[in-house]
From Swiss-Prot:
Name the UniProt record assigns to this protein: Argininosuccinate synthase 1
InterPro entries listed in its UniProt record: Arginosuc_syn_C, Arginosuc_syn_N, Arginosuc_synth, Arginosuc_synth_CS, Arginosuc_synth_type_1_subfam, AS_cat/multimer_dom_body, Rossmann-like_a/b/a_fold
Encoding gene (name): argG1
Protein source organism: Rhizobium johnstonii (strain DSM 114642 / LMG 32736 / 3841) (Rhizobium leguminosarum bv. viciae)
Gene Ontology terms describing biological process: argininosuccinate metabolic process; L-arginine biosynthetic process; urea cycle
Residue numbers binding ATP: S10, Y11, S12, G13, G14, L15, D16, T17, S18, A37, G118
NCBIfam families on file: argG, PRK00509.1
Amino acid sequence: MTKIEKIVLSYSGGLDTSIILKWLQETYGCEVVTFTADLGQGEELEPARAKAEMSGVKDIRIVDLREEFVSDFVFPMLRANALYEGQYLLGSSIARPLIAKHLVGIAREVGADAVAHGATGKGNDQIRFELAVNALDPSIKVIAPWRQWNIRSRLQLSEYAEKHRIPVPSDKRGEAPFSIDANLLHTSTEGKSLENPAEVAPDHVYQRTVDPVDAPDTPEIITVGFERGDPVSVNGKAMTPAALLTELNGLGGRHGVGRLDLVENRFIGMKSRGIYETPGGTILLAAHRGIESITLDRAAAHLKDEIMPRYAELIYNGFWFAPEREMLQALIDHSQAFVSGEVTLRLYKGSASVISRASPCSLYSADLVTFEESTIAFDHHDAEGFIRLNGLRLRSWAARNGR
C-alpha cells in the first residue's frame, strides 16, 4: 500500500476533529493540514486555529466561504423551493459539497495524498463528503477515522481525549454538549435526550430563535426583493447574499420563525431526530413562493413542484455534483427568468406570512379575474365547452361502470 505523506483534514476544532487530528498524526506519521470553512458559524473559528496550533499543525487554513455558500449553494437550492421530506430546508446537506470542493482544492494545492473528515459511520455526512470527492477528484484517497479506529462511543472518545490531554468541551451548564452544526442557513442540534423522539426538546437547545410564545406581541412587516429568482434586498436595501441572509436570520430569530423538531429518514437507512432553526431560510422560502405565484406560468409552477422532491433528495443524499442534479438545476434556473419583484411578509410569533406581492413581470391580471365588469373580453359561455371536453372521459368512465 502506498504510504500517505500528507493529509488535509476538514477541521472544526470540536472534540471529534481534535481527536481525529491527533489520531491521524499518530496513525499515519505524516503532515496534517487543517481546513476550517467559515460558513457563518461564528465563535468556533479562532478557537479552532488555537487548537490546531497546540497540536503542532504548521499549515492551518481558515477560509471565509460565507458569500460563496449563500450565492452558489443556498440560493440555487432556494430557486427550487427545496424541502427534504416536505419539511427540512437542507441546512447541513447544502454545506457539505462546498466544504468538499475546497477540501479537494487545498489537497491539490499542497500536494496531499488524502483528505479526511470527522463524519461518523451512522450519518449522512460521510456519504456527502465522499460522493463529492469522487465527483471532483477520484484520485484523492478519503480517510474516515470513525470507520477505521476502535472508538465506538462518546465515552471512549472522551477517554482518548483525556489520555492525550485534549480538552473536552462542555456547555454553559457544565454538561457534555449536544451535537451541533451551524452555518448561515441554519443551526441543527442532535444527540443526548433528543435521541428519544417521545421526549420534548429542552428550551436550551434553541440558540438562534426565541420561543414564539415569548416573541414580540407586535408583528413586524418586512419586504424582500427578488431578481431572476434570487433575493437581492431587504426593506429596499440592496445587500450581498451573505449579508441578506444574516439580516433575515436576525429578523426571523427574534420573532421565533424557523423552528423545526423533525424525525427524518437518513440515506444510510435509519431514522434520526434533530432540532433545526432556519429563520432566514424560512422567510426566503415563503417570499420566493410568493413571488413565483404571480410570475410563473401554471404548468411551469406545477412541473417545478413535481421535480422538487427529487431535487431535494439528491442534495440530502450527497449528489450535488451529480449530472442529474445539474440537469434539474438547469431547468429550475431557466424557470426563474421572470421571477423578479417584491414580497411583503408579516413576522409574528413563529410565522412568516406573505401579505402582498408585486412584480413588473406579473402574469396576474386583475381585469381578467375580477367579479366586476371587465375591459378584457371573456365569454363566460366558453367555460361550458371547457367543462364538457374535460368531462368527456369521466362520462365514458361512468357509463362503463353503470353509474
